[in-house]
Amino acid sequence: MKKCRYCKKQFQPITTLQKNCFDPNCVTEWINEVKQKNWQKKKAKLKLDLMTLSDYIKLAQQVFNKWINLRDKGLPCISCDKPINGRVNASHYFNANNHWNVRFNEFNVHSSCITCNQYLSGNLIEYRSRLINKIGIEQLTLLELEANKTRKFTIDELKQIINKYKLKIKQYEHNEL
């Protein structure tokens, strides 16, 4: 005997997977639940199909920034070297809107306090000196060369970036536990 998922009465199931009795109200609730689940799946697929290139860029940037903030968790601000208390920004050394080629480059983006990133426009003079200490002058030179190249991302490339950083976030969070 099993207990019905909806009316909580005892019933004899026909199969081991059956979770509700054959009362018309319970069957109706079960059918509505199945329809709702199917609609949610269909809606999610439709939403993905309607996403534009700019939607994928925004999503890729959100996932990438989340990864940067997790990677740099506990480190001081890259620009002012003060401990980051509260909200954190993923600060781009080369502006993300003007230098598309290094927009998702991990050497170009580091955690920064809101004061430096938003109110001091990245505090770039201090950022550069600390960036040299962090990644080295050779890597910074390569980054500067890459930054001057032009690039346009395709939706498939952005999907790969999203999946790559979602996986990194998942692995990081799994290792944290």
Residue ranges and their predicted role:
Residues 1-63, 151-177:
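A boundary/linker detector
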Residues 6, 23-25, 78-81, 115:
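Short, cysteine/histidine-rich loop/knuckle motifs that typically chelate Zn2+
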Residues 14, 19, 70-73, 106:
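Residue-level signal for mature regions of secreted extracellular proteins and peptides
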Residues 20-25, 38-44, 92-100, 128-136:
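Short cysteine/histidine-rich metal-coordination sites, predominantly Zn2+-binding motifs
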Residues 25-32, 85, 109-136:
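Short Cys/His-centered divalent metal-binding micro-motifs
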Residues 61-89, 113:
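Short cysteine-rich loop/turn motifs with clustered Cys
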